[in-house]
Amino acid sequence: MTMYGGHIHLIIGPMFAGKSTELIRLVRRYQIAKHKCLVVKYEKDIRYGNGVCTHDNMSITAVCTPSLDKIDSVAENAEVIGIDEGQFFPNIATFCERMANAGKVLIVAALDGTFQRKPFSNISELIPLAENVTKLNAVCMYCYKNGSFSKRLGDKMEIEVIGGSDKYKSVCRKCYFF
């Protein structure tokens, strides 16, 4: 691939919106088309073992890393790079831009905001670099309308708390404040 063949597809939304499911679906299409694919996940996310796994147990093999800088040599051999939980990689924008300019297809799944509805600055930096941005919604777990936000259960205030339905609920605007 040349630098003109590379592009970035960013999939954003709250918890339980299907971001990882969409990432897996898109990567599998490239695998069927015989492209060399690499899937990357954040090392501290140990909820489902070494692969990227959805909340309904769909999975795909992945390389675990604490930093995208550590996978450069592996990424060089891939044509398509899928990155799950992109919000946890501080340098995701520079990594994706560099790889896309080298002709690679990047598919990134990430939260668009924290449980406090504040943006992840690294994802905000990636948006203007992406050719395609897909914003997914979940279902509000209280009123069953569209859920656009992630609400944390409990009183932990740090930003990086990895968990599933035991720690977070997807909520609509109204239910966010309950």
UniProtKB/Swiss-Prot annotation:
PROSITE patterns the UniProt entry points to: TK_CELLULAR_TYPE (PS00603)
Gene3D superfamilies for this protein: 3.30.60.20, P-loop containing nucleotide triphosphate hydrolases (3.40.50.300)
**Superkingdom in the source lineage:** Viruses
Q: Name one GO molecular function term.
A: thymidine kinase activity
What EC number(s) is this enzyme filed under? Answer: 2.7.1.21
Q: Which Gene Ontology BP terms does the record give?
A: DNA biosynthetic process; thymidine metabolic process
Q: Which residues bind substrate?
A: F115, I159, E160, V161, I162, G163
Q: Which residues bind Zn(2+)?
A: C140, C143, C172, C175
Q: Which residues bind ATP?
A: G13, P14, M15, F16, A17, G18, K19, S20
Q: Which reaction does it catalyse?
A: thymidine + ATP = dTMP + ADP + H(+)
Catalytic residues at E85 (proton acceptor)
This protein's UniProt keywords:
ATP-binding, DNA synthesis, Kinase, Metal-binding, Nucleotide-binding, Transferase, Zinc
Q: Which cysteines are joined by disulfide bonds?
A: none
Q: List the InterPro entries.
A: P-loop_NTPase, Thymidine_kinase, Thymidine_kinase_CS
**Which PANTHER family does the record associate with it?**
THYMIDINE KINASE, THYMIDINE KINASE, CYTOSOLIC
What family does this belong to? Answer: Belongs to the thymidine kinase family.
Output this protein's name: Thymidine kinase
Q: Which organism is it from?
A: Rabbit fibroma virus (strain Kasza) (RFV)
What gene is it encoded by? TK
